[in-house]
């Protein structure tokens, strides 16, 4: 016997999770609905591998000299650095560039899959998670960006999120770049300070205008005593940035007018405002007013966005880990990234896309009761009488007949007795079990026990003697009538579930 000290400890790596059947079914149910909407819009599925050459990830690497920083990387036999994909956008850029001559332009695609982050895990922060992306490559007009926003709105509603419980918030990176240029932060030399400004604005919902003011200036001291160094902007520059974030009006037209005033005289900023105005016109033409909102506070953190940026936000309250009521918040976002594909091509390649955080959206739908898979029906289990190996072929025929009729079924293949088999069937959420002992076999019959009805009746019968004598929810039928009898039981259970859900 092996020494106990030699036993390997079973443990899950930090930042990763196992997914159980209900989670998998819920995810597939949700993603099937998303695919339906994307297909309706004329997007095509594509799949790229989990592994890419590290240099193909480009700006996704925080430090080019340390490829393991932020991504999971390894070297192959040729000493080429390979990495698990960090998101789904960089692999798409590589795929489009590699197949550019044969793909239709614009190229409209969607894909879902796992992405990996070599970062410190924490509550709600995982090293492996799923994204669902849609992108249009080769469309320079903001109509492609507007379409992304409208498609996301339709997706949320198809998933059961009511109008008024979500908003697609839209901004334009060019408008903010115009503001940054106006306060003297133009050019590559100010890239770090520009990024600090972006990060400060991104905290508007969390810290409010005064908190952002501190982050734009010398810095902010939080309640725990931790100090975050600010962007060190002068007061006049801070006021200009805050005027931009406060430009939201009562409606899109008012917001656009306010933004025009903020960037007046700056060509890049004015171009961005005009793009927002063009998108606003498309939203109205499509009937999306109120569902898609121009919002100057939207600043996606990724540096490669070059034009419109957008975010899908759920507006209903949930209870956080501290028992506080908070707005659920973002479940996805995206924008225009004209520079990503052109890294491979050496020529401008316009692109825009949207990414959904699958796990986060699943959590939202479960909170709303829109993703219930608790009524999943397990397989019918054909029990095997104790040590009855001679009649396995007979049991197997029953299972095959049920499967041919489209009924989920399995023959018990373990080595336990009848009591343990019944417990197994219960854990499998079996709707019923099929039993054939020697007496039933001689008579050409089978017993079918309705486990759902039996569980209900057991609550009404307190006397064990009465229970054994009444044998509730158990019927005996001819062996050739097995399929029809099982189907009747399953249909009755389905009707009961439908009635209970009303």
Swiss-Prot record:
Assembly notes: Homodimer.
GO molecular function, one term: histidine-tRNA ligase activity
Record EC number: 6.1.1.21
The protein's enzyme class: ligase
Full protein name: Histidine--tRNA ligase
PROSITE patterns: AA_TRNA_LIGASE_II
Family: Belongs to the class-II aminoacyl-tRNA synthetase family.
One Gene Ontology cellular component: cytoplasm
Catalytic activity: tRNA(His) + L-histidine + ATP = L-histidyl-tRNA(His) + AMP + diphosphate + H(+)
SUPFAM superfamilies, sorted: Class II aaRS ABD-related, Class II aaRS and biotin synthetases
Alphabetical list of PANTHER family matching this protein: HISTIDINE--TRNA LIGASE, HISTIDYL-TRNA SYNTHETASE
Keyword Phosphoprotein: no
Sorted UniProt keywords: Aminoacyl-tRNA synthetase, ATP-binding, Cytoplasm, Ligase, Nucleotide-binding, Protein biosynthesis
